[in-house]
Amino acid sequence: MNKAVIAIHGGAGAIARAQMSHEQELRYIQALSEIVESGQKMLEAGDSALDVVTEAVRLLEACPLFNAGIGAVYTRDGTHELDACVMDGNTLKAGAVAGVSHVRHPVLAARLVMERSPHVLMVGEGAENFAFSQGMARVSPDIFSTPARYEQLLAARAAGEMALDHSGAPLDETKKMGTVGAVARDKFGNLAAATSTGGMTNKLPGRVGDSPLVGAGCYANNASVAVSCTGTGEVFIRTLAAYDIAALMEYGGLSLADACERVVMEKLPALGGSGGLIAVDHEGNVALPFNSEGMYRAWGYAGDTPTTGIYRE
C-alpha cells in the first residue's frame, strides 16, 4: 500500500439509524467529509502526519456536532472539562492535557506540551497556565456550551436520580460519551495520532478517561500503527486498548485487521467495553472497527475520494 492516508472519527456509541433524521445524517456526513478532505489535501501537499492529525482534530473541536471543544458535554456540576492527546510515531514523543476549561482547542495545548515542555501530560489549571504562557488565549467555558448538550445533561441527571432511587442500575454509558480523533500516515512513512474529548455527560468533576492517556486512547509508532479510540474510557484504560493494537502487531505478528478484531470485538466486550477505534499501520492499511451501534467516521488516501460512515453497514 505505502500511501499517504488519513482517518477520522467523531465518536462511537448508541447511534441508531431510527433515531436520526435525514437532515441530521447529512450534517454529520458533510462535516466528516469536509474535515477528512482537508486532511487529504494537506497530505498531498507533503504536510507531516503530525500536522495533519492536529489540524483534523482542531477542526473537529470547532464543530458543535461532536463532543470535543465547542459542543463538549457537561460534568455533573454543569461545567466543562476537556482532554486531548497527540503522539508522533516517528519520535514517540507525545503531549496531552486533561481537565482544561479555558482553552479553545485542547489538541493545540497538547501539541504545545509535547513540543515546548519536558512533560507528556499536564492537567487542570497548570496545563492552562502553560498553554497561556505559550501564547494561547484564555476563553470563557461558555464557548463550549450548546443547548443540545445541556438537554443531555438534564436527561442524564434525571435518569441517574431515578436509577439511584429505584434500580441501582448505572446509566447507559454508550449514550453519554463521545470523542473525536484522527490518525494519518504521510508520504514519508511517518504515523501520528490525536484524540480529543469533553468526556462523559454527567461525569464527576475531575474524571479523566482514556483520550489523553498515551497507550489507552491514543498511540502512534512508525514501527507498527497509529490509533485513536472512542468509547467506554475506563475499559480502554484498563486494557491499554490503543497500545494493545500495536503490541499484537509488533510482538504477536498479527495484521492490523486481526489486532483490531481481537481488541475491539473480544477484549473490550469481555470487560463491558463499548466503542471503537480508527487505525492506520506503517504500510497505510486502514481499520475502523467498532462494537457499538455506530461510529462517526471517514477516511481517504491522498488523491482519492473519501469514504464516510455512521452506522454498521
UniProtKB/Swiss-Prot annotation:
Modification comment: Autocleaved. Generates the alpha and beta subunits. The beta subunit is thought to be responsible for the nucleophile hydrolase activity.
Residues annotated to bind substrate: R207, V208, G209, D210, T230, G231, T232, G233
Keyword annotations: Autocatalytic cleavage, Hydrolase, Protease
List of catalytic residues: T179
The EC number(s) this enzyme carries: 3.4.19.5
Keyword Hydrolase: yes
Listed Gene3D superfamilies: (Glycosyl)asparaginase
A GO biological process held by the record: proteolysis
Reactions catalysed, as given in the entry: Cleavage of a beta-linked Asp residue from the N-terminus of a polypeptide
GO MF term set: asparaginase activity; beta-aspartyl-peptidase activity
Pfam families attached to this UniProt entry: Asparaginase_2
Class of this enzyme: hydrolase
Site positions (Cleavage): G178, T179
Subunit structure, as described in the record: Heterotetramer of two alpha and two beta chains arranged as a dimer of alpha/beta heterodimers.
Functional summary from the UniProt entry: Degrades proteins damaged by L-isoaspartyl residue formation (also known as beta-Asp residues). Degrades L-isoaspartyl-containing di- and tripeptides. Acts best on iso-Asp-Leu, followed by iso-Asp-Ala, -His and to a lesser extent iso-Asp-Lys, -Phe and iso-Asp-Leu-Ala. Does not act on internal iso-Asp bonds (Als-iso-Asp-Leu-Ala). Does not act on alpha-Asp bonds. Has poor L-asparaginase activity.
Name the UniProt record assigns to this protein: Isoaspartyl peptidase
